[in-house]
């Protein structure tokens, strides 16, 4: 069975040809350092861009970085052009290619490049709405990739997957989709895994729809790792899933331990399986979270045990590298008094119990610390949009030793926390303020968690090259041998008894997928969060049913839904009246709380009015807009009003930016 993953729309009029021609022209002129003034006119240079690196350049970069500085790139092979979005307003295009660059010492390096354009063509005029170019150096272990202090990885992202052994003598790292092992004691370098090298290089091997994650490395340099996404080669060729592998350094061979198949696309499988599968070689235990069920599988004894079931997104959390997990052990999301925390790397686990009559909610991990919330059922109330809510009265952070590291309680100000978003080292507390039995949105709270840097003999750090800017390297405190020996390619050995698990791919709850810069950027279970992320990446939000929820910039400047007037019936609240009126549209209801009024104009432009909550929990129905004004119906009076955008912004901000949208 062949699976295809795409979205098809048929807009009335598109200008794809003109936009693609512009992108190709811009791409060529940037490479050849031509038409500098012409390209500069399309840019918006400011402090939003880091002009000390070539790893990522964007529309805010200076023209020097757009035109590759002194790098003198030469394209290898063909440029792959991909139309990601095309509508009546803009076209999004992603180009993928390889370039060869020669550094100041004459050494040639190969880079994988992704170049993104969002372009508008209007009345014979081209507008560059967004531009982003990422590059990643392909490591090949040449002599020039080493100096007396360590390994020079070059221009790569800072968030590569890597692990250091306990003796701090060896490093296993992933670069450009390939897994490498360096042993400083012997000066040995091994390319452990590479999709192209499994059977030679061709178009299949160059497919970038897979990723590699290092799970662990021991002091004998044996490595446990995962390959997830689309399998272009091997016994699982053509499948999407995650393979768990063990590299035996002494034997120089790789053994497959398990393979979990998925019917989902690579991007979604990568997002889910990249965190929800963990294998510990020393115990032969594999933990898999599949379709809401957490399994512990003993590969040595061939035994499978269910640890927990019905785990919705709110009932568990996993660390970025997958080795830490927490889940509620009983009850529903807001009715569980116990959390079970597992360190799958060390095998340690412990539980946290709530005070009598209270419940606990898992929120996530940050730098190895666990975050959870305390819930008192007595705090249950309703939001201004009419939904029942039981917010957290306190948020606690506990370190890896299960000791309290911090706590956050705002109840003295009648403020409670609904959830916490984790982005790198930043925690964002989404909060509400209590007014009787009603909760209104209030200002977010931001907390930075700075990880203490542990002393290590191997450090992954930044350094600066005169011609190529910021680069990354592994620095070894004891230095490295001048002459490196590159080992033979490992032998692949299919598992004697490989475990295979199939994920059905049926979502039990609605999810919202954010696509930006031509790729999946994030997945959320709340539409409002997805819209805010899509704003940051100039992207789109797609629901689980493949419906467009929101698009950056794709709306008419003037629009009216032609919705009629209506009025509250006797004993009916303004919110109930609005929702009664919206029943005729037979549309899907979305909570878009936290979004801006400007973002919500797109939702109106989809053809349905939307509900906005003003101060004092008063609901109105937004029915249309112009470039300067917005029109709404107030069910309390039954009249239609038109006010300026800034006035309506003040009105909706007073209601906590609470919006209820509808799509169909």
Model-predicted regions and their roles:
Residues 313, 350-362, 403-423:
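Conserved blade-ending motifs and adjacent loop-strand segments that build the rim/top face
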Residues 3-70, 146-188, 196-197, 204-210, ...:
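Core segments of small alpha/beta cavity-forming domains
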Residues 184-187, 249-250, 298-302, 343-347, ...:
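Short loop/turn segments that connect beta-strands within beta-propeller blades
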Residues 89-128, 132:
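Exposed beta-sheet edge and beta->alpha loop/turn motif
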Residues 561-664:
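Conserved active-site-adjacent core of cysteine acyl-enzyme catalytic domains
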Residues 130-131, 189-198, 254-262, 305-309, ...:
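Beta-propeller fold detector
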Residues 85-99, 221-227, 370-375, 429, ...:
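A short hydrophobic beta-strand element
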Residues 61-107, 210-219:
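Surface-exposed, charged secondary-structure patches
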């Amino acid at each position: 069975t062949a699976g295809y993953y795409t979205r098809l729309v048929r807009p009335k009029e598109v200008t794809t040809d003109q936009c693609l021609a512009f992108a190709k022209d811009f791409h060529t002129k940037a490479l050849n350092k031509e038409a500098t003034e012409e390209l500069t006119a399309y840019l918006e240079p400011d402090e939003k861009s880091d002009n000390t690196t070539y790893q990522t350049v964007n529309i805010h970069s200076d023209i020097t970085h757009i035109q590759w500085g002194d790098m003198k790139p030469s394209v290898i092979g063909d440029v792959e052009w991909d139309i990601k979005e095309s509508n009546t307003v803009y076209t999004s295009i992603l180009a993928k290619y390889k370039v060869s660059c020669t550094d100041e010492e004459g050494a040639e390096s190969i880079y994988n490049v992704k170049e993104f354009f969002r372009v508008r063509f209007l009345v014979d005029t081209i507008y560059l709405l967004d531009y982003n170019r990422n590059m990643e150096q392909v490591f090949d272990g040449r002599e020039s990739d080493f100096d007396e202090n360590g390994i020079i990885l070059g221009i790569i992202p800072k968030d590569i997957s890597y692990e250091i052994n306990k003796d701090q003598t060896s490093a296993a790292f992933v670069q450009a989709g390939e897994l490498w092992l360096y042993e400083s004691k012997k000066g040995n370098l091994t390319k452990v895994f590479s999709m192209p090298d499994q059977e030679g290089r061709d178009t299949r091997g160059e497919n970038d729809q897979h990723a590699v994650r290092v799970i662990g490395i021991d002091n004998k340099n044996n490595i446990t790792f995962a390959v997830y996404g689309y399998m272009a080669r091997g016994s699982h060729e053509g499948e999407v899933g995650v393979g768990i592998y063990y590299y035996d350094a002494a034997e120089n061979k790789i053994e497959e331990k398990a393979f979990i198949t998925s019917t989902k696309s690579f991007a979604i499988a990568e997002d889910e399986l990249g965190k929800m599968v963990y294998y510990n070689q020393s115990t032969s235990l594999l933990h898999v979270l599949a379709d809401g069920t957490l399994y512990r599988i003993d590969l040595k004894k061939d035994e499978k045990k269910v640890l927990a079931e019905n785990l919705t997104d709110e009932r568990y959390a996993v660390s970025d590298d997958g080795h830490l997990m927490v889940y509620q052990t009983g009850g529903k999301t807001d009715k569980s008094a116990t959390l079970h925390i597992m360190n799958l790397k060390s095998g340690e686990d412990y539980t946290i119990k709530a005070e009598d009559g209270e419940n606990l909610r898992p929120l996530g991990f940050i730098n190895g610390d666990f975050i959870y919330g305390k819930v008192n059922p007595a705090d249950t109330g309703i939001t201004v949009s009419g939904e029942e809510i039981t917010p957290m009265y306190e948020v606690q952070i506990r370190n890896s030793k299960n000791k309290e590291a911090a706590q956050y309680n705002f109840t003295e100000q009648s403020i409670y926390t609904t959830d916490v978003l984790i982005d790198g080292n930043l925690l964002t507390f989404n909060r509400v303020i209590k007014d009787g039995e009603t909760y209104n949105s209030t200002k977010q709270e931001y907390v930075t968690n700075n990880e203490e840097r542990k002393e290590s003999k191997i450090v992954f750090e930044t350094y600066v090259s005169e011609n190529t800017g910021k680069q990354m390297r592994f620095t070894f405190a004891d230095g490295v041998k001048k002459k490196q020996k590159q080992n033979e390619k490992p032998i692949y050995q299919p598992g004697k008894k490989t475990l295979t698990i199939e994920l059905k791919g049926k979502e039990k709850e609605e999810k919202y997928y954010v696509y930006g810069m031509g790729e999946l950027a994030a997945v959320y279970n709340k539409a409002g969060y997805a819209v805010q992320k899509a704003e940051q990446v100039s992207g789109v939000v797609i629901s689980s049913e493949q419906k467009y929820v929101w698009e950056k910039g794709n709306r008419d400047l003037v629009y009216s839904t032609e919705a009629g007037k209506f009025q509250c019936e006797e004993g009916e609240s303004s919110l109930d009246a609005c929702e009664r009126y919206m029943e005729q549209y037979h549309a899907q209801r979305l909570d878009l709380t936290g979004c801006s009024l400007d973002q919500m104009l797109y939702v109106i432009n989809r053809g349905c009015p939307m509900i906005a909550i003003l101060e004092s929990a008063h609901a109105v129905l937004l029915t249309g807009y112009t470039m300067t004004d917005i029109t709404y119906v107030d069910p309390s009076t039954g009249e239609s009003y038109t006010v300026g955008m800034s006035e309506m912004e003040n009105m909706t901000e007073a209601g906590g930016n609470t919006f209820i949208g509808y799509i169909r």
